[in-house]
Amino acid sequence: MDFYREEDYGLYALTILAQYHNIAVNPEELKHKFDLEGKGLDLTAWLLAAKSLELKAKQVKKAIDRLAFIALPALVWREDGKHFILTKIDNEAKKYLIFDLETHNPRILEQAEFESLYQGKLILVASRASIVGKLAKFDFTWFIPAVIKYRKIFIETLIVSIFLQIFALITPLFFQVVMDKVLVHRGFSTLNVITVALAIVVLFEIVLNGLRTYIFAHSTSRIDVELGARLFRHLLALPISYFENRRVGDTVARVRELDQIRNFLTGQALTSVLDLMFSFIFFAVMWYYSPKLTLVILGSLPFYMGWSIFISPILRRRLDEKFARGADNQSFLVESVTAINTIKALAVTPQMTNTWDKQLASYVSAGFRVTTLATIGQQGVQFIQKVVMVITLWLGAHLVISGDLSIGQLIAFNMLSGQVIAPVIRLAQLWQDFQQVGISVTRLGDVLNSPTESYQGKLALPEIKGDITFRNIRFRYKPDAPVILNDVNLSIQQGEVIGIVGRSGSGKSTLTKLIQRFYIPENGQVLIDGHDLALADPNWLRRQVGVVLQDNVLLNRSIRDNIALADPGMPMEKIVHAAKLAGAHEFISELREGYNTIVGEQGAGLSGGQRQRIAIARALVNNPKILIFDEATSALDYESEHIIMRNMHQICKGRTVIIIAHRLSTVKNADRIIVMEKGQIVEQGKHKELLADPNGLYHYLHQLQSE
């Protein structure tokens, strides 16, 4: 459906917003159901239509200065029907990125122009999935269900901690008795009894402490395994656009933040929190000994807290800077190792080394600033501790001299105060770890809170036959990016061999990405056997589509495992048959290990042509009903290409084949050749038919290659 009429702008906007939330839309069906008079959707009809798509839509009135706090994109509703979509706001520059429904293109508006168009009415739109996602986002609250799940283990840890605190409470009392009773009365028999009892208490304390550490480490390890498994599953479920918009090093750096969370969970910080919980009991006993000395200890706590509150924001900023520098280093390292052949071929090692040295210096400098600040924080805590110790000693001595406190009671009080202050000091000293794990949770949340490809509610349709239809396709990779495909209409019949040619950047490969459902078009539908791919389960679809790219990646496994990657239990006969069709069987047979040869990382142990033939065999082995060759033979030598072309009739038999190529000789025998230019189909026909038009783009490209 084409949205050129002004009264259809509301329906067009709903289509775009629904597709933004990965919800398939049939515009004709919505128009038939909700636009009964053919005059466009009014506000009530628009909200009902949104509700029918399971979108949560709500009309609000907002002043311009409050727009920075709303969730975007949102529809700006105008009474004259000239609605537009607000996608982004730059508060500092006072600029607004909108999607113009009239021109089908993004526009950047200055403040004055936006004010002239904005009438104060907005429709906020969210999907149920996004609302659930926000409620279930990954942050510190994610660990609460995990704690509840393992509550039995944590209760056991709590019970052990209670006994440890009881022993910690008994030990000072033993010392008090020894100082005040045994030494004064020279009670050797009492001393022996107390010594044996103290030894038993110490032994139990050591055993229980070790048991608590073991139980706690065991439970946190389980949580760590769950988090790691969830992270990897989520990472693989992310859409292809997530990886295309981020550097590999950034993603790797975020995944490595799991190590920081693991160290925090298995460290002493959380057990210190348990110890701190029992401080109230110790305070009660200390108050019984001496209210004055207890007030000194209590008075020190705000200083510990104040110092931590003061240092935390600065530490967090420096940790952010350290992470950013580390991510830059990770990205540069991955890029350098991946492009090592290019670096050596161009002899640019000195330039790369110089860049690395600068980035490494920035990272080390950022790390040094973090360490320096952390040291200052720890020394501040130690200073407060020493001051409190001096005051306690001075005041305690006065109380002993005045007869208000015995020497044994003073020693016992100091031991009890140590039990209270020790976890406080440990927590204060571990504040850097807490700040670091907070950064790690945020960084990891960038991965875990990113929406995955939507599978829920998607249809797993029957085995596909191979009919493909592009209907009024308009597509761009980002809302503010140029249009890649514009008004593309194309029907491909089952079993047809289609060649697609055109200049670089004309949108050839983008068509195949839409077939694989890596993206959903901004407007229009991609249909396979009449089924809208926006409604289809991506995994169901991709299992039935074979794809061979210009640069294919092999995994560090055997040739057999690479060919049978989608079905490891596949019979050897099928693997060999696919390899023969791809022209790979002969060179594989000549290898010492044959099909069991390990190809190395990314297939480094093979030549480019050999890697490509294995990739073709991998695409053929599952007998896909749709086969896509995206410049698949451009990296082959002439002999290998000749083998592939010789087998092409057998390869294409019983399936729909799409061949994207710059070399026109590759597609000249196709049933139909599609010629693309600037995102549109400008010509189509057989090889001879297209050559017959001297003014056509195909004829022009053929002439260039003939020369």
From Swiss-Prot:
Cellular component GO terms held in the UniProt record: plasma membrane; type I protein secretion system complex
Effect of residue 692 to R: In strain: Serotype 5
Binding site for ATP: 502-509
Domain Peptidase C39: 1-125
Biological processes, Gene Ontology terms: killing of cells of another organism; protein secretion by the type I secretion system; proteolysis
Membrane topology, record value: Multi-pass membrane protein
PROSITE patterns xref list: ABC_TM1F, ABC_TRANSPORTER_1, ABC_TRANSPORTER_2, PEPTIDASE_C39
Transmembrane annotation, as ranges: 158-178, 188-208, 295-315, 387-407, 410-430
Keywords, sorted A to Z: ATP-binding, Cell membrane, Cytolysis, Hemolysis, Membrane, Nucleotide-binding, Transmembrane, Transmembrane helix, Transport
Top-level taxon: Bacteria
Single GO MF annotation: peptidase activity
InterPro entries: AAA+_ATPase (IPR003593), ABC1_TM_dom (IPR011527), ABC1_TM_sf (IPR036640), ABC_transporter-like_ATP-bd (IPR003439), ABC_transporter-like_CS (IPR017871), ATPase_T1SS_HlyB (IPR010132), P-loop_NTPase (IPR027417), Peptidase_C39 (IPR005074)
Residue ranges of domain ABC transporter in the record: 468-703
ABC transmembrane type-1 domain location: 154-436
Annotated active site: 83
Localization per record: Cell membrane
Main subcellular location of this protein, as a coarse class: membrane
Function: Involved in the transport of the toxin RTX-I as well as that of RTX-II.
NCBIfam families: type_I_sec_HlyB
Anything else known: The sequence shown is that of serotype 9. In strain CM15 (serotype 1), disruption of this gene prevents production of both RTX-I and RTX-II toxin, and no hemolytic activity in mice or pigs.
Family: Belongs to the ABC transporter superfamily. Protein-1 exporter (TC 3.A.1.109) family.
Quaternary structure, from the entry: Homodimer.
Name of this protein: Toxin RTX-I translocation ATP-binding protein
Gene that specifies this protein: apxIB
